[in-house]
Amino acid sequence: VDIFPEHCPENPSEYLKEITVEHLLTMSCGHSTDPTHESWEVKDRSWIRFFMEHPVTHKPGTLFCYNSLGTYVLSAIVQKRTGEKLVDYLYPRLFRPLGINNVSWIESHEGINTGGWGLFLKTEDLAKMGLMLLQKGQFNGCQVVPAEWIESASSAQVPCVPAGMNSDDADKLRKVAKTSDWLQGYGYQMWRSRYNSFRADGANGQYILVIPEKNAVVVTTAHIQDMQAELNLIWKHIYPAL
């Protein structure tokens, strides 16, 4: 609300006014449903406004609900604060130090990188990202990202449930917590996984899986609906061989 007063509803709820950047990072804004897919049909107003108009049913920080539109708002915050689109801001600070040169990121109708989706990278570039994460922000001897940030981002900050569900549905899933990679906790835009690992993932099975105990990174690109099945194959066949 403080960052985008121009997009704020006329009478914002107290819960809406409480949302912080950390709530956006941890997908714990207090929404009980994800407005992302609905936003794609919105062309007559800002997606930031659409995000703010979505009902905040719980106190921020108390309910996990996977929400890519919240990540879009993070991208918008970077653009407003720096004057650069997210992809341009990251080029000299992240992509170029990792030797990643060809990056494409979809933009919204209002000229903001989508943030939570639409980033196109080669598989080997995803592996570079994973290696940097494994090495706590270092790559080729340079500290690209502060180690403290990697530690916080990859640690469980909030309890979580699979995308498409919210924490109100969590109790029925706890009995399978030991076999689910979506019940291990959520950090800053990254999931915790089994075997004390963590990951960045994209729709339909795009994974950067970081396994510190094995000093390993596993990267996949795929088109699969059952993303847990893909991870199960990694744990069954690749993990024991590491």
Where are these regions (language model features)?
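Short, gly/Ser/Thr-rich active-site loops of penicillin-recognizing serine hydrolases
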Residues: 228-242
